[in-house]
Amino acid sequence: MSAEPLPAEEDRSAYAGVLRFYELAKHQEWAVRDVPWGELPPVPEGKGSPHRQARRIDVWRSVVMQQLQADVLACEMAAQLLNAAPDPEARLYYSTMVQDESRHTEAWLKLIGRLGGEGERDPHLDALGHMFLEADTLEEKVFLMQVFFERLIIPRFRLIARSSRGTVLEDLCNRLAIDDGIHHGAGMAYERVLLEHAPQRVKNTLIDAANRMLPEFAAHALWRPKAREMIGHLMEARDRERLKTELNHGVRLAKSLGLDVSDVQLPF
């Protein structure tokens, strides 16, 4: 009796990019205990009267609160992607992303605990979270979360790090800029695979999703809690210019995926 021939191995070379980001994520893994908690001040230390110092702490606490809020939502989104992805290479990657977002949340919780606890929530960030979680297709979830949001948020980490030299906050922002760069790169790699044979109607839904997301992201980027209202007014023109540059870059990324971006409506 002759042995049954083994089935030909499926060609998985299209997923090589996703696997590369899985390996990179494993290489870059860090632990919350690695953060220099006892060696550096949590945030820049203010000078002047106790009242002035307390106001300065409130400003930094509001910055940390926004990042904590974003990463709590990101935990849900990453878990949803892990559950939704059918491909083993993507599931391997998303298993690391779930760990990353949980680690980020733990670190932000520790940091904000040293600044007096949680503060005012950003309503636009909550709206973005609902938009991501309620997206209908895997293509849309990856597009909104990793292709757009993760990429658009990286410059903010770099900006916060530059403004908080020699602190735990700077250390965390530098770590998260690297992690989110990997999340974004993996999302680009996986979205290319997902869109390679996707029908035009799926691609059209991504443009519709971008048009829903971009105004909300702009509102989120420009929103300031009460603790930062005055600073926000002083820096609004610069913030708008920076945001415009970032959104244009996001549109170029969408175009690089083979999407027709002519119908994307920028909020500026």
Please place each PLM-identified region on the residue numbering.
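Amphipathic, well-ordered alpha-helical segments in soluble domains
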Residues: V43, A70-M77, H104, F149-R156, ...
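Terminal targeting/low-complexity segments that flank the catalytic cores of oxidoreductases
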Residues: M1-R91, R114-R121, D136, E140, ...
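Short amphipathic alpha-helical segments with heptad-repeat character
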Residues: M65-L68, V72, S95-V98, S102, ...
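Amphipathic alpha-helical segments within well-ordered protein domains
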Residues: A78-L82, S95, R158-A161, N174, ...
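Carboxylate/His-rich catalytic cores and anion/metal-binding grooves
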Residues: D87, Y93-G116
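Active-site-proximal alpha-helical scaffolds that flank and shape metal-associated catalytic sites
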Residues: K110-H184, N211
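Secondary-shell segments that build the walls of catalytic and ion/ligand-binding clefts
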Residues: P155-R156, R165-A227
